[in-house]
């Protein structure tokens, strides 16, 4: 079993980040790994002994750090598993690589929360944040890729952003995704994209076909 100090040191060595930000980043990641009723900045401060303002400034001013580190770690992990690509599900499926696309809705944490929307979530309506998770599966190992954030129309107006629908964002993501950065040279026909019926969109299908991939919906 790995003790706390070893865990911290291991995580510390994986992060490509300015030295002065590493302490805040590390404590925030550790805080997100524990099970608590509410992952708030105040709770993160209580857990770490740092000031709430340190976490607030870190999240507000360094959003690119998380994206960059996730990209680097995903590529590093993928390259460890890709030298010998095996068929998925221990050889029971014809493909060797799978990309999973699935949306997640996080319930709002308070009445006054930015970028929340009322979503139809199958069994009723949910008010919260939405983003789209993208996961790569190689040799039955799950590797998270950068998720796709969704911004509401009101949030886009307030922050001078161009509003895009969730499906339009998925199309853009697929167009820009270069699998070769993760698994090197490969046969696109060995890649399957798995998504739920909410992504049964002609533009998404065309984006996947353009990459020579295969789309599978329930």
Where are the language model's segments positioned?
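Electropositive, glycine- and tryptophan-enriched low-complexity nucleic-acid-binding patches
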Residues: 56-58, 121-186
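Gly/serine-rich nucleotide phosphate-binding loop at the start of the catalytic core
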Residues: 1-68
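Short, conserved catalytic/metal-binding motifs centered on acidic residues
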Residues: 44, 95-109, 134, 190-200, ...
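Short, structured coil segments at secondary-structure junctions
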Residues: 211-212
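Short, charged/polar micro-motifs that form catalytic or ligand-binding hotspots
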Residues: 31-34, 45, 121, 160, ...
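Active-site-proximal, Lys/Arg-enriched surface segment
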Residues: 61-142
């Amino acid at each position: 079993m790995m003790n706390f100090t070893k865990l911290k040191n291991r995580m510390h060595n994986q992060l490509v980040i300015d030295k002065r930000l590493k302490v805040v980043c590390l404590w925030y990641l550790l805080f997100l790994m524990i099970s608590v009723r509410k992952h708030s900045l105040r709770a993160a401060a209580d857990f770490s002994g740092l000031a709430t303002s340190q976490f607030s400034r870190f999240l507000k001013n360094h959003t690119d750090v998380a994206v960059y580190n996730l990209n680097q770690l995903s590529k590093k992990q993928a390259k460890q598993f890709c030298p010998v690509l095996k068929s998925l599900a221990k050889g029971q499926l014809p493909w060797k690589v799978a990309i999973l696309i699935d949306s997640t809705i996080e319930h709002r944490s308070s009445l006054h929360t930015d970028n929340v929307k009322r979503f139809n979530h199958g069994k009723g309506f949910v008010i919260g944040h939405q983003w789209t998770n993208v996961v790569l599966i190689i040799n039955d190992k799950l590797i998270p890729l950068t998720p796709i954030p969704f911004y509401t129309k009101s949030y886009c107006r307030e922050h001078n952003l161009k509003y895009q629908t969730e499906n339009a964002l998925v199309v853009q993501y697929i167009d820009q995704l270069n699998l070769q950065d993760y698994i090197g040279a490969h046969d696109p026909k060995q890649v399957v994209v798995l998504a739920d019926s909410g992504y049964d969109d002609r533009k998404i299908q065309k984006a996947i076909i353009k990459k020579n991939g295969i789309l599978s919906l329930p």
